[in-house]
Amino acid sequence: MIMNFNMEEWEPRTQLGRLVKEGVITSIDEIFEEGHPIMELEIIDALLPDLEEEVIDVNLVQRMHKSGRKVNFRVIVAVGNKDGYVGLGQGKAREVGPAIRKAVDDAKFNIIKVRRGCGDWGCVCGREHTVPFKVSGKSGSVRVTLIPAPGGVGLAIGDVGKTIMRLAGIDDVWSHTRGQTQTTVNFARATFDALKQLSKVKASEKDLKNLGVCST
């Protein structure tokens, strides 16, 4: 589902928000590069207007309270523009609808830029269709390793991973998993963590070019 946002109705509450609305800042990359904290969801909506959301998991959570048993819904949501930006978030509420909205907001605040490239040695297409190099992420007992794949392979990963990859704009990937991968939450978080690790690997401009990674 694509989310709607009305720029005209937005009244920024922060200096960063005002710079975005005034058109001084026109790219989310500018904010990421400067390391500015994003305090308004509207900043994400304005700079990434084509974000889509997907519910990854809905779970009923019970806990004991002095007034009795409390029941909440815990929802995991992924958002992305299918072109290099993806986020993962969690929301809790007594009803599913509010829990989803909280999870969407949390996912927006967790948006990252995903490094993509043509990292498989057998593929020289030069498109940013896969991960540029092997990378791993973990959450709890789950460890997910993403491996570059040539064009046409598709997403060789579990359904939860497929959703996150698709929203990130990755078309082809091999994967290897360990741990309790049937635990949806940890599988999603480990996959997202692997994508985050892509940006933490230091590489020269020459190496990035060889891997088909766009430096802009």
Swiss-Prot record:
PANTHER family: 40S RIBOSOMAL PROTEIN S2 (PTHR13718:SF4), RIBOSOMAL S SUBUNIT (PTHR13718). Belongs to the universal ribosomal protein uS5 family. GO terms for molecular function: rRNA binding; structural constituent of ribosome. Residues 51-114 form the S5 DRBM domain. HAMAP family: Ribosomal_uS5_A. One of its GO terms (biological process) is translation. It comes from the Archaea. The N-terminal domain interacts with the head of the 30S subunit; the C-terminal domain interacts with the body and contacts protein S4. The interaction surface between S4 and S5 is involved in control of translational fidelity. GO terms for cellular component: cytosolic small ribosomal subunit. Keywords: Ribonucleoprotein, Ribosomal protein, RNA-binding, rRNA-binding. Part of the 30S ribosomal subunit. Contacts protein S4. The keyword Cell inner membrane does not apply. The lineage of its organism: Archaea, Methanobacteriati, Methanobacteriota, Methanomada group, Methanobacteria. This is Small ribosomal subunit protein uS5. NCBIfam families: PRK04044.1 (NF003125), uS5_euk_arch (TIGR01020).
